[in-house]
């Protein structure tokens, strides 16, 4: 058993995408950015060996955790300081119904060091509960954080950017080097804060259409808007919507994507 795969007696499981955070300075920075307070409806995804769970547990009385690895869930159940504070849900966060954690007038505050192999689909799952969430703090691949926070005209701007910014304000918090983990991942990491809007600034009448215009555009990034959407919208219709047909999809703002989606929803039967 190689020592670089083992932390606190637990061997990292590749199939769960486990990399355990072990840098006290970084841990302190993450917990400070979360700023957990007693009485808040806190939920940690993938607590692992408790790098964030333990310091958060010192600041609050009760919170929930979702852990897929049975061995790690068992460790938490027997943790001398955390056992009485935690409500442990054993299972896959990708399939978890977060509405079961809703409390009156106490929105969810979700945080975690997400497995990088599922981080993007997991965020899409979490966005479906956006109206019940106050904020989310996640450790992700730095490249994913760059995509979340990107603006139009930048290489990192894509479908994930548009969908994340449709639901929330995106704030990069801090960067994390590979040596802050055991085992060290092959990529740089970063922490991001996602704060869902109480009122969506650019509401879409049918999210299937928004997803479709994003997919069709960003799957053909080098094509112009007129060529990406020629089966859906004429040049005149694009111009009426304030979209320059000579631009590429990466130059289109969130508001323009929503305008296109809403027009298509009003004028076509199925997304």
Curated annotation (Swiss-Prot):
Q: Which GO terms fall under molecular function for this chain's record?
A: 16S rRNA (adenine(1518)-N(6)/adenine(1519)-N(6))-dimethyltransferase activity; RNA binding
**Top-level EC class, please?**
transferase
Q: What Gene Ontology cellular component terms go with this record?
A: cytosol
Q: Which domain of life is it from?
A: Bacteria
**Has the keyword Thylakoid been applied to this entry?**
no
Which chemical reaction does it catalyze? Answer: adenosine(1518)/adenosine(1519) in 16S rRNA + 4 S-adenosyl-L-methionine = N(6)-dimethyladenosine(1518)/N(6)-dimethyladenosine(1519) in 16S rRNA + 4 S-adenosyl-L-homocysteine + 4 H(+)
Identify the Pfam families for this entry. Answer: RrnaAD (PF00398)
Which residues are noted in the entry as S-adenosyl-L-methionine-binding?
19, 21, 46, 67, 92, 113
Q: Which SUPFAM superfamilies match?
A: S-adenosyl-L-methionine-dependent methyltransferases
* Summary of the function given for this chain in its UniProt record: Specifically dimethylates two adjacent adenosines (A1518 and A1519) in the loop of a conserved hairpin near the 3'-end of 16S rRNA in the 30S particle. May play a critical role in biogenesis of 30S subunits.
As for family, the record states: Belongs to the class I-like SAM-binding methyltransferase superfamily. rRNA adenine N(6)-methyltransferase family. RsmA subfamily.
Q: Which NCBIfam families match?
A: ksgA
Name this polypeptide is given: Ribosomal RNA small subunit methyltransferase A
* Organism (species): Photobacterium profundum (strain SS9)
Q: Which gene encodes it?
A: rsmA
